[in-house]
Amino acid sequence: MTLWINGDWITGQGASRVKRNPVSGEVLWQGNDADAAQVEQACRAARAAFPRWARLSLAERQVVVERFAGLLESNKAELTAIIARETGKPRWEAATEVTAMINKIAISIKAYHVRTGEQRSEMPDGAASLRHRPHGVLAVFGPYNFPGHLPNGHIVPALLAGNTIIFKPSELTPWSGEAVMRLWQQAGLPPGVLNLVQGGRETGQALSALEDLDGLLFTGSANTGYQLHRQLSGQPEKILALEMGGNNPLIIDEVADIDAAVHLTIQSAFVTAGQRCTCARRLLLKSGAQGDAFLASLVAVSQRLTPGNWDDEPQPFIGGLISEQAAQQVVTAWQQLEAMGGRTLLAPRLLQAGTSLLTPGIIEMTGVGGVPDEEVFGPFLRVWRYDTFDEAIRMANNTRFGLFCGLVSPEREKFDQLLLEARAGIVNWNKPLTGAASTAPFGGIGASGNHRPSAWYAADYCAWPMASLESDSLTLPATLNPGLDFSDEVVR
């Protein structure tokens, strides 16, 4: 029984699904998808649970959320192993994901008070008040790269605000989704407040098509995000928060310490086997001898990166991709770019058939026209040379995406120029692209999405503002508008 609906674990009535470790092939999870009727059942349960959950005080809802945080802490080792085995990422990185889940809860609670709590301003004849109210029933779509942390960034703020939820994890990480849901169950969530439906495309389409849905919170690919946007078009009554991908540029301008710059670039491009929406996809490198030396060092160090199993000792920097198919898609993208005229500096290699262990790839595309503006979701970096910083900024902005942009340079003036001209939601200076502050907005513009699905700014789209003018008594104004006469003679 792998669906959790209205407080009960039930068996899915849809297609059967088996999840294997992407490196070893070990069977980790088996179950059945939720069919359309079960998705509707989950929605009815969430709708029935909404009034009571929304009417609880914030303090009462907060108790449940904080209990969940405690369960994450006490089950950290077990959840770390589940995430690592299911995604293929090394144990050390899965542990950082669980830590991030725990830390985001305190941030979410503070954010609710600061951004969407209650405010009151006294007026001569009363007061002006601002309150926030939950939307109702929300669908949360989770991604596979951070199957615990990223859905958590939607679920926790939504629950604090008083919403009820239908959660669909990625079909590639059903085990992680179920494991997190069992912790919510232990935390004492009332039946129907949070419901789990497993499944792929058909389940997702049934969920997003629900008429009795007040909103949808999505993290995933741009293609799926666009489909959801089209599906919900013409329904302004539904909140739609999309966090999608990026074709992120990293500008290497002047390099004082080549090793430090190479380290930053590898952290930006290849951590999580390149499976972060924040990863650098385009390396913009200043022409010249210094750029040549940097690139040679980057290739040499990247060549020594060997992906390994989640529990290898010593731990590898990167593990496998989410599936062999995902790894093969990266290889195919490299082959296509090479056929277009790209110069391969480091060829990505699948270490063993039947696994997802893929070595990093680097290809130079300077002077090649018609390069697709697409996110290749894996350890693969494309390189372009530039001559002037103005040219670098134009190249950085030459994308339909707008999530992340980074600059390596000792010159503050160039960073200030980039801040003024960059089309990106996050712009870093001498910091990896894969680093972001939890207390800052996270998200982008253009094809990278809307809203800001971090714990801090997620509060904004998990509740709607209600403004009020209030007075505890009704009195006739001392001064009336022209044309109004309440004299005794007129009244009689």
From Swiss-Prot:
EC number(s) from the headed UniProt entry: 1.2.1.71
GO molecular function, one term: succinylglutamate-semialdehyde dehydrogenase activity
A Pfam family of this chain: Aldedh
Listed pathway(s): Amino-acid degradation; L-arginine degradation via AST pathway; L-glutamate and succinate from L-arginine: step 4/5
Disulfide bonds: none
InterPro entries named among the record's database cross-references: Ald_DH/histidinol_DH, Ald_DH_C, Ald_DH_CS_CYS, Ald_DH_CS_GLU, Ald_DH_N, Aldehyde_DH_dom, SuccinylGlu_semiald_DH_AstD
Biological-process GO terms, alphabetical: arginine catabolic process to glutamate; arginine catabolic process to succinate
Keywords: Arginine metabolism, NAD, Oxidoreductase
Catalytic activity: N-succinyl-L-glutamate 5-semialdehyde + NAD(+) + H2O = N-succinyl-L-glutamate + NADH + 2 H(+)
Keyword NAD set for record: yes
Gene3D superfamilies named in the record: Aldehyde Dehydrogenase, Chain A, domain 1 (3.40.605.10), Aldehyde Dehydrogenase, Chain A, domain 2 (3.40.309.10)
Residue positions binding NAD(+): G220, S221, A222, N223, T224, G225
Classification via PROSITE patterns: ALDEHYDE_DEHYDR_CYS, ALDEHYDE_DEHYDR_GLU
CDD domains noted in UniProt: ALDH_SGSD_AstD
Record: active site: E243, C277
Function: Catalyzes the NAD-dependent reduction of succinylglutamate semialdehyde into succinylglutamate.
HAMAP family found in the cross-reference section: Aldedh_AstD
Family to which the UniProt record says this protein belongs: Belongs to the aldehyde dehydrogenase family. AstD subfamily.
The name this protein goes by in its record: N-succinylglutamate 5-semialdehyde dehydrogenase
Gene: astD
